[in-house]
Amino acid sequence: MGNAYIVGAVRTPGGKKDGKLKNWHPSDLGALVLDELVERTGAKGEMIDDVIFGCVSQSGAQAGNVARNAVLSSKLPESVPGTSVDRQCGSSQQAIHFAAQAVMSETQDIVIAGGVEVMSQVPIGSNIIDSFKEGHGQPFNGKGMMERYPGVQFSQFAGAEMMAKRWNFSRDDLDSFAFASHSKAI
């Protein structure tokens, strides 16, 4: 099994609601990061085997495989594929794991992983809210889920409470872990 290495990292400035990045199309924002990463690392575009981006709200400007659209908006060759991952808050982290797995399994050599969201254009939850408005139903009331989890109203909050109860995590345990994690990131 091969090894995977992170050889470069690029990000846009942190944005805020209706801030300076609000009018950037998500594909163009992703393309900016792709082009800068290739520039900084000296990689040749044709050497890139894949682009994997996390994106939670894949609707509106972020629909239609935003990772591939970012590739097409970038200077990378059209031959470079791209795929988008939705693992909710862990989407970009999952993209990195998928990239590492591809390299470690030796099925790919160079993979760019990251994520893109322009929440001023596609606010959190808008993909579900818009679906409700259009009468397309909701994602958490399939027969199998309703039978397996009777009376459970699914949300990140309910899920967090269920996991804390099941694994016996106290609020203090979780706060301490979150504080330690945040401290490592700064």
PLM segments and residue spans:
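N-terminal amphipathic/basic leader segments beginning at the initiator methionine
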Residues: 1-15
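Acyl-thioester C-C bond-transforming condensing/cleaving domain
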Residues: 2, 16-47, 60-66, 71-186
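Conserved beta-strand segments that form the floor/walls of ligand-binding pockets within enzyme
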Residues: 5, 52, 84
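Short glycine/serine/threonine-enriched helix-capping/active-site loop
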Residues: 7, 53, 114
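Short glycine-rich phosphate-binding loop at a beta-alpha junction
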Residues: 47-54
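Short, internal active-site loops enriched in acidic
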Residues: 56-58
